[in-house]
């Protein structure tokens, strides 16, 4: 027997412009599916948004989810919207909560933003590239060692403002994030996943509920995309088995092809980019979680544990 959807759904999210744009997508999809349901937004400022230093000094990736989770668990909100890449995979979700749906995946690629429209290969020696992502820093060090990465934290709008103020010469940002805030006009070049392997969970929004809210879970689960669910499951299990931390340069991309076959390509780097471990497997008869485990084990056999444990965090 189908349960009726709740009359009101309070949606909690980070209060950045990008996060609130993501909430509007969720509200629109809910309205299309359940026209009679009202929604309210509960914006919260997270530790990760307030702290612009090294994330390892606060709570790593959990710095972007702690306050959102607290609002959900306290009953202040009913539904949380997360970027999957910001949700720690080295630990379970907070007790009493579940992911009810993964929305259809957006673009996973990174973009270069340069005021004069230069491409990555056109950047001259010593160009200051703004990014605080250890994943991006390691890959740039490996392929473009003549560039200089400078720490750049803050939401996308803030980073664009800092670029305009001359604090860097170029920026690396997620294509999906620029799409969400309507700023694709600043993109100089979209980087292929071969040039810049994306982070785990790139371009995926997850809807999180309290596990006892069965009517709400049923109402929002229909927003989920089956292909994205398979990809997210493989990627998050991969990261869970690796037990990476926020200073670990780890990248990975699971993909369901047109025939429905799932594969996972992943890498672990040293921070200086001088060592890169690679693994790429097709699921075949394996379920997504088992594929993620298999790829992680393949990298562990190559020495990933020693690299990860050797990085301060």
Curated annotation (Swiss-Prot):
Pathway: Porphyrin-containing compound metabolism; protoporphyrin-IX biosynthesis; coproporphyrinogen-III from 5-aminolevulinate: step 2/4. Binds 1 dipyrromethane group covalently. Pfam families: Porphobil_deam (PF01379), Porphobil_deamC (PF03900). PROSITE patterns: PORPHOBILINOGEN_DEAM (PS00533). GO terms for cellular component: cytoplasm. Belongs to the HMBS family. The porphobilinogen subunits are added to the dipyrromethane group. This is Porphobilinogen deaminase 2. The gene is hemC2.
């Amino acid at each position: 027997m189908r349960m009726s959807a709740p009359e009101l759904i309070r949606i909690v999210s980070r209060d950045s412009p990008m996060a609130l744009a993501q909430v509007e997508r969720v509200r629109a999809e809910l309205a299309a599916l359940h026209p009679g349901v009202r929604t309210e937004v509960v914006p919260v400022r997270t530790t990760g948004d307030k702290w612009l230093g090294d994330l390892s000094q606060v709570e790593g990736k959990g710095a972007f989810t702690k306050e959102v989770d607290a609002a959900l668990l306290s009953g202040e909100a009913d539904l949380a919207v997360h970027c999957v890449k910001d949700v720690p995979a080295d630990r379970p979700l907070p007790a009493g909560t579940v992911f009810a749906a993964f929305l259809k995946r957006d673009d996973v690629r990174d973009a270069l933003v340069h005021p004069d429209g230069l491409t990555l290969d056109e950047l001259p020696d010593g160009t200051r590239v703004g990014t605080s992502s250890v994943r991006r820093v390691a890959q740039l060090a490996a392929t473009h060692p003549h560039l200089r990465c400078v720490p750049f934290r803050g939401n996308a709008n803030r980073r664009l403002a800092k670029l305009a103020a001359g604090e860097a010469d170029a920026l690396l940002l997620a294509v999906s994030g620029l799409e969400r805030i309507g700023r694709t006009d600043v993109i100089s070049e979209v980087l292929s996943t071969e040039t810049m392997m994306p982070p785990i969970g790139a371009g995926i929004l997850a809807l999180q509920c309290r596990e006892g809210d069965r009517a709400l879970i049923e109402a929002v689960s229909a927003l989920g995309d089956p292909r994205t669910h398979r990809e997210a499951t493989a990627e998050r299990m991969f990261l869970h088995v690796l037990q990476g931390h926020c200073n670990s340069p780890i990248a990975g991309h699971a993909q369901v092809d047109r025939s429905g076959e799932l594969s996972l390509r992943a890498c672990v780097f040293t921070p200086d980019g001088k060592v890169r471990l690679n693994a790429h497997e097709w699921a075949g008869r394996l379920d997504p979680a088992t594929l993620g485990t298999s790829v992680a084990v393949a990298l562990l056999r190559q020495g990933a544990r020693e690299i990860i444990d050797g990085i301060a965090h």
